[in-house]
Amino acid sequence: MRRPPLVVMAIVLLSGVAASTSAADTTTTTAVTTTTTTTITKTVPHRRVAALTGRPDPTAVTKRRSALTIKMDNTPQAHPQYGVNEADDVYEEIVEGGITRLAAIFNSNLPTIVGPVRSVRRTDREIVFPIGGVFAFSGGAQYAISSIETAPVTLIDQSNAGAAMFRDLSRPPPHNLFANAELLMKEGGRVHSPPPLFTYASRKVPAAGAPVGSFTVNFLSGFATSYQWDGKTRTWLRSIFGAPDVTATGVRVAPTNVIVMSVNYIGGVGVEGSYAQMVGSGPVEVFSDGRLQKGRWFRRNIRLPTAYRSASGKVIALRPGQTWVELLATGETVSVYARP
């Protein structure tokens, strides 16, 4: 872990920023027609493919910079958010009180406004350890900071970010801290390009699994998140708090893939100081290319990315694009609905 020297934070007041207010062991399903699965060939990202999305990277720009993970607020007061649609991958985790927060990982794009930015939690160490690079956050309790300090990342918070973090006074605190990803990346020191977190399928090979119209990740405390398949864009249209999830720039949040991992929260679900145990194995539901594959996730140690395998033991391959990973507590459910 490398942490830059502390400097006085420069607070930039952006009055012009828009201020619009805003898997599991048990799965509830309606009738979903299962089709014959086909083998998807495993592909490994090479120097012309972005490691964190599997998309073409003809200039290899993603190989010349580290990954940047920014901790984001996800409460109703934090919406609409900035920059989440430009992340390569996003992890959604449960924190105290059962609410969720996001860890958005940037490598392909470096938006000038990301946020709102919030504090670190112990689960973040589990997420970023194999990724490395830069981890940006607002601050945090000492136990959480001590945890993230053991990860191989450069830590940047509002005390040493300088102009890379700023407050929008048109929004109420603490939901008004934002970050400039490009400036944060410049504080990251030596480049450590990230490893691939997922296996991607060839576009020529049909997707495996049962066709799905929509599904809901049943987080507690009113944070249930729904996704609806859009065949035109081949993405999952995300909704939260009973409404479409739309960014502050008017873009619908629509990941290419959604992975729902069923994990144990050590210390209790929604309890302060608890964290998602992401080393070991557990049930997983993978939604990609309009289909669902059930299987298990495996992770041998914290330094390695998670592996995902189907019920038959085959590697689950994703469609290249943005991936969301939902860290659902063991015992919470996913409701799956057939296509109309």
How should these model regions be labeled?
Residues 1-8:
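Bacterial N-terminal signal peptides that target proteins for export
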Residues 15-35:
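C-terminal region of N-terminal signal peptides and the immediate post-cleavage residues
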Residues 32, 37-89, 96-340:
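A surface/extracellular/periplasmic glyco- and lipid-processing/surface-interacting theme
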